[in-house]
From Swiss-Prot:
GO terms for biological process: DNA recombination; double-strand break repair. Coiled coil: none annotated. Disulfide bonds: none annotated. Belongs to the RecO family. Keywords: DNA damage, DNA recombination, DNA repair. The gene is recO. Pfam families: RecO_C (PF02565), RecO_N (PF11967). Involved in DNA repair and RecF pathway recombination. HAMAP family: RecO. One of its GO terms (cellular component) is bacterial nucleoid. This is DNA repair protein RecO. InterPro entries: ARFGAP/RecO (IPR037278), DNA_rep/recomb_RecO_N (IPR022572), NA-bd_OB-fold (IPR012340), RecO (IPR003717). It comes from the Bacteria.
Amino acid sequence: MLQKTVGIVLHVLKYNDTSNIVEMYTELSGRASFLVTVPRSKKATVKSVLFQPLALIEFEADYRPNTSLFRIKEAKSFSPFTSIPYDPFKSAIALFLAEFLYRAIREEAENRPLFAYLQHSILWLDTCKISFANFHLVFLMRLSRFLGLYPNLDDYHAGDYFDMLNATFTSVRPQLHSSYIQPDEAGRLLQLMRMNYETMHLFGMNRTERARCLAIINEYYRLHLPDFPILKSLDVLKELFD
């Protein structure tokens, strides 16, 4: 059955000489895999250049039962980027977040609130004119809400440790495991959780602190998501912002 929807590009894999497999998070059905024919002429209805990291694609696909790979018939840009492909910092963030989402989101079901969050965030990054150095950090902390991983902030007191394994702040250093962060870093993490895209530029954070926050967030997700790997694009992002 042919259906139209909008998707966010997470990953592209060469399938053979004539086709690619594109992983997208879609408004209609959540995470899904699509077969895209590599165009051989300028008149092709689906162009490979569309499928850039985090690109928003409006497309029509043949959703057939009893298969996990759907063929895309037509595709076009839903909201063409104005800055992400041309800004090396934004491009690096997009590459990192696309890989992160590809590894973190496995849900093959409609989740419109999550899709709306992703779409809003991507468009905000593309159009923002203010500082966005903390964007990926705020994005990942807010993403944890949709994945059921958001830490409990209610019991925080100054001087608390953050127990990453149990996702709670605690006044007592955890004794049964080493997956926790010290009080000074826990306070910085709490500050990060309270930021949003409009206010994050008001919070001062140097490169070392930013890199440490990213390492903590990445480790937090690895603790809570089975088989979450070390991301290849993480080093690229670190080098660019160093």
